[in-house]
Amino acid sequence: MRPLDGITVVALEHAIAAPFCTRQLADLGARVIKIERPGVGDFARAYDSRVRGQASHFVWTNRSKESLTLDLKHAEAPLILARLLAGADVLVQNLMPGAAARLGLSYEALRAAHPRLIVCDISGYGADGPYRDKKAYDLLIQSESGFLSVTGSAEEPVKAGCSIADIAAGMYALSNILAALIERGRTGQGKRIEVSMLEAMVEWMSYPLYYAFDGAPPPPRAGAAHATIYPYGPFPTGDGRTVMLGLQNEREWRAFCDQVLRRPELTADERFSTNSRRTEARPQLREIIVQAFDLLTADQVVARLDEAQIANARINDMREVWEHPQLKARRRWVQVDTPAGPVPALLPPGAADVDAVRMDAVPALGQHTEAILAGLGYGAADIDRLRRLQAI
């Protein structure tokens, strides 16, 4: 039995933040009914065609869900939604600001009709305040949260390589929903959860915020290196490759000098006697490290780092991650079905094995419409009528 077996989630969702949240609920056993626009669906279906003609974002965030096509603005939609929500435990939505209320799905209306329902609203900026009506996409929230200001090189800010603001919001939505389900078990009452992408990202920005507390200068942009710990970042090796390494304390600094650089005299050099001084003397220390590594291959550098118990990593590309020996050794890849055939998917972190989670198919658009409506009491003639009316 999975943790959320028996829980039903209705999702009015698109893009990444809400779908990422609800996919994880599905991973844990919840039944997730994804409502999509007839003929078009979640617009993330059209982001690209990299996975055998399917969008990479959509394949990632939508396995194990049921797809119901429904025109939310159609006159027939309120009754269908009412029947769905009568049997639901959770409603997750990330529609445009104000759209849910215009559809009659304000929290006040939902609470009156379904007092046990947990309602999770995900938005860019929250339901009030001067930014409440602004559109919000991942990169825009990276900008507003200050993330771009501390990411990249000294010359140019750089965005994260994945949808970090969407992921942050999705994770906080997930944890709040799980907490609300526990709370409902005690009180018998649902509740409203409001997750703002901006607030999720600003929480993740707490270290640079505190670093710049009381008007102090913020952490400098340092590329792939750490802004305030050194050496902690990428270094080239003599065979044209790159090794990432990180030191966290003075014991590691001494081991790095003795066993990796093989220059023990550096431990007595006042320029490098503390992390703060090493950070201030970054250009001089980097030159010393690069000169030493230029005489070694990446494998030799890694061997020395491992012997000295210095944390290190290779900078893998996506092909190398697919083939990562650690993930293979731990059997973290499983096959999931899609409309274009099976593809590999990573077991959810924390899952002991495939039996502990749901890893079902990525749905085709509207694949489950008839079955879901039949479960709500609609007969074949009713469903045909709804199709003729273009409600589904």
What would you call each of these model-derived segments?
Residues 1-186, 221, 364, 370-392:
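N-terminal helix-loop segment corresponding to the beta1-alpha1 unit
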Residues 39, 125-126, 197-202, 239-241, ...:
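Glycine-rich beta-alpha junction loops
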Residues 58, 222-227, 233-234, 245, ...:
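Short Gly/Pro-enriched turn/cap motifs at secondary-structure boundaries
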Residues 67-69, 141, 241-246, 358:
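Short hydrophobic-aromatic micro-motifs
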Residues 170-190, 203, 207-213, 257-262:
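Oxidoreductase and adenylate-handling cofactor-binding alpha/beta cores
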Residues 231-308, 312:
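Aromatic-enriched alpha-helical interface/lid elements that frame and gate functional surfaces
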Residues 307-357:
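A glycine-rich dinucleotide-binding beta-alpha-beta segment and adjacent secondary-structure elements
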Residues 338-385:
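Flexible, small-/acidic-enriched active-site or ligand-binding loops
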